[in-house]
């Protein structure tokens, strides 16, 4: 049986409009939730994006 991959995929969700705008990958051993300030095309401004499951 194959080993489990160390890379997991997740989406970045806008905190203002709750749209999933970006999809990223990270190492499974990194336990902290990722928070990035990125551009939201729906809000038309830079907002805080937090990690959420796909």
From Swiss-Prot:
Coiled coil: none annotated. InterPro entries: Ribosomal_bL33, Ribosomal_bL33_sf, Ribosomal_zn-bd. It holds the Pfam family Ribosomal_L33. GO terms for cellular component: cytoplasm; ribonucleoprotein complex; ribosome. Keywords: Ribonucleoprotein, Ribosomal protein. The keyword ATP-binding does not apply. GO terms for biological process: translation. The keyword Lyase does not apply. GO terms for molecular function: structural constituent of ribosome. NCBIfam families: PRK00504.1, PRK00595.1, rpmG_bact. Belongs to the bacterial ribosomal protein bL33 family. This is Large ribosomal subunit protein bL33.
């Amino acid at each position: 049986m194959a080993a489990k991959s160390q890379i997991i995929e997740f989406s970045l969700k806008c905190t203002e409009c709750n749209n999933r705008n970006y999809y990223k990958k990270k190492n499974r051993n990194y336990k902290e939730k990722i928070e990035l300030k990125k551009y939201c095309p729906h809000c038309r401004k830079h907002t805080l994006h937090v990690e959420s499951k796909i």
